[in-house]
Amino acid sequence: MEEVVGGGKERKRPRGALVGVGGGGESAATAAAWRTSRVARAAAGGKDRHSKVVTSRGLRDRRVRLSVPTAIAFYDIQDRLGVDQPSKAIEWLIRAAAAAIDALPSLDCSFALPAAASSPPPPAADDAEVSTSETSKSSVLSLANAPCDNGGGAFAELLHCSNTNGSKPLQQQQQATLAYYAAAQSAHMAAPMSFEVMAMPPHLAFSQEQQQHATVAAFDRGTLQSNASLWPPPPQPPPSQHPFLLQRFAAAPAEVAGLPFFLAGGVGGAAAAAPAATTNGGERRLQLWDFKEERKT
């Protein structure tokens, strides 16, 4: 045993604590206990792979970087000793230099030991705790970045509509928007132009229905890119052009003599809607012609 003076108090420590070698079994066990109490564990579960040790100058890493000449000389000694672990070569060097180490001045051992060293190591079941080492930090960062990758995959699935649960609200919203647009358009055009549906030529009505069916079919396809290109729907002709077309057909029936009679069942509806289309009572009412009867007379 040797006396250590520090802070006005005399403390004793085993000589083998620094040398690593004791005179008997008791000193070796005491030195081992002293070294164990100076380990600051940074990882849980009893793993000291990245732990640090408590020294007179604070915490220090167990890994030591050597210069090139020192590393070459050290590995030559390790090869000559025939050991496979560098720590065994270090232990041999410490034992060989025991006399020179005893001649060195003693250290102040009044430094405080870490609280984790005095408490027993946690059980192996607590491996979920995060280590403060660089390797553990990199693994934690990789785990933290995992949701971003999943978020990118979910966004790709949303674009291709492979996620059925996520695409249903989108399709319902698109169908509701299309129904609202169709209802608003029909309500806007029904009041002033109630006779347009009955008085429209068949080829014009067929083209308008075909255009509306194409729009609905495009929305039912379900892809975001196609819907984005087809929304808003193509503009419809203004309502002011329909009376002009109807007046042209009514004013010059001889020009459409080749067309069949297409207003046979709409006399009552056209007559009821005609007063709403006239202004100041000066416009001509919509006249219906039966071209076959006219040819007979």
Curated annotation (Swiss-Prot):
For this entry, list what GO says about its biological process: regulation of secondary shoot formation
Listed GO cellular component terms? nucleus
Compositional bias (Basic and acidic residues) at which positions? 282-297
**Please, which domain of life does this record's source organism belong to?**
Eukaryota
Q: Where is this region: Disordered?
A: 1-22, 116-136, 273-297
**PROSITE patterns recorded:** TCP
Q: Which residues form the TCP domain?
A: 46-104
Q: Assembly and partners?
A: Forms homodimers and heterodimers.
MF terms from GO for this chain are: DNA-binding transcription factor activity; sequence-specific DNA binding
Q: Where in the cell is it found?
A: Nucleus
This chain belongs to the protein called Transcription factor PCF8
Main location per UniProt? nucleus
Lineage, opening ranks: Eukaryota, Viridiplantae, Streptophyta, Embryophyta, Tracheophyta
Summary of the function given for this chain in its UniProt record? Transcription activator. Binds the promoter core sequence 5'-GGNCC-3'.
Stretches of the chain forming a coiled coil according to its record = none
Which species? Oryza sativa subsp. indica
Keyword terms, alphabetized:
Activator, Developmental protein, DNA-binding, Nucleus, Transcription, Transcription regulation
